[in-house]
From Swiss-Prot:
This is Methionyl-tRNA formyltransferase. (6S)-5,6,7,8-tetrahydrofolate binds at residues 110-113. It comes from Synechococcus sp. (strain CC9605). It is an enzyme of class 2 (transferase). CDD domains: FMT_core_Met-tRNA-FMT_N, Met_tRNA_FMT_C. Belongs to the Fmt family. It comes from the Bacteria.
Length: 338
């Protein structure tokens, strides 16, 4: 098949590689324009653009595809059979979606209709979902509302970070998209409703949830919340969740709630950490213990939380005992106090 690929972040690269490796002709790659990054504010290409150039593929970088008629004309001239979209970063207009005769297909990182929108992986972790997955969806004008052709599920582990989960879902998306292509090709051209009927797609049920864009305040830890809620924020927003200790900002990178289901791995010198520090009587965010080879035990609602890895403002990320030395904290100090 002749495929026009749309994608931007590293998450999309495995799908591009998989389609290319499966023998499909990638007639073009559409990605977001280069952005200025880092201290030097140098222009940096997207991971998809960098990979496409390594593969010798033509690349297009429209600032706003909806308004770029010149780019639309160039893409139409490529003669793609289908468009494949994975985390492109712009909403595609109807005329672009309907251009390829075999349709436009999206690899989405959730079990639709749960977590439509731009941050499904983060929100699945934040809300404590037990499983998630990926779906190959026929695209339409609505945001992630199209019928689903293929879907694959995966469990969410308590200690998964958003980065680890994204890597799993990215690989699943690549596998599933390769499986989808011969099915889409076999359905042939013609009216969309007839093609989709041949493919026996699943129309999304009611009861959708929306993965809204995250804002700065979402990343700040609230120590009055439950240990599980704080842990989910740390893992779901990795590596961006933060707190304060006195006048310093601390990025919290890895935590473990001191709960029974983690009892076997939460031990030191053969003694379980679970149940050692009742939180009653301690204000939220209070440092209850500093364990040299593990980290800090901090009070929260319900049970304490173990901070295993963090990054103090102006320092490199670190684990115990270096973290304890950098913080210069004492028992009874409180996170969240400025």
């Amino acid at each position: 098949m002749n495929i026009l690929f749309w994608g931007t972040p590293a998450y999309a690269v495995p799908t591009l590689d998989a389609l290319h490796g499966a023998g499909h002709t990638i007639v073009g790659v559409v990605t977001q324009p280069d952005r200025r990054r880092g201290r030097g504010k140098q222009l940096v290409p997207s991971p998809v653009k960098a990979r496409a150039e390594e593969l010798g593929l033509p690349v297009f970088t429209p600032e706003r595809i909806r308004r770029d008629d010149d780019c639309k004309a160039k893409l139409a001239a490529l003669g793609a059979d289908a468009s494949v979209v994975v985390a492109f970063g712009q909403i595609l207009p109807k005329d672009v979606l309907e251009q390829p005769p075999l349709g436009s297909w999206n690899g989405h990182g959730s079990l639709l209709p749960r977590w439509r929108g731009a941050g499904p992986i983060q929100w699945a972790l934040l809300e404590g979902d037990q499983e998630t997955g990926v779906g190959i969806m026929a695209m339409e004008e609505g945001l992630d509302t199209g019928p689903v052709l293929l879907e694959q599920r995966t469990p969410i582990e308590l200690l998964d970070t958003s980065i680890a989960l994204a890597e799993r879902l990215s690989a699943l998306t690549a596998e599933l998209m390769v499986q989808a292509m011969p099915l889409i090709e076999a359905a042939g051209t013609g009216p969309e409703d007839e093609r989709l009927a041949k493919l026996n797609v699943r129309v999304q049920a009611e009861g959708s949830t929306y993965a809204r864009m995250l804002e700065k305040q979402d990343f700040q830890l609230d120590w009055s919340a439950s240990a599980l809620s704080i842990h989910r924020k740390v893992m779901g927003l990795h590596p961006g969740a933060f707190t304060q200790l006195h006048d310093k900002r601390l990025k919290v990178l890895r935590t473990e709630p001191l709960i029974e289901r983690l009892q076997d791995q939460l031990s030191t010198e053969g003694r379980s950490l679970v149940g050692q520090w009742p939180t009653g009587g301690h204000p939220p965010g209070t440092i209850l213990a500093m364990i040299e080879d593990l980290g800090l035990v901090v009070s929260s609602s319900g049970c304490p939380l173990l901070i295993r890895e963090a990054q103090l403002e102006g320092k490199a990320r670190s684990t115990a005992p270096a973290l304890l030395q950098q913080l210069k904290a004492t028992l009874g100090d409180r996170f969240g106090e400025v």
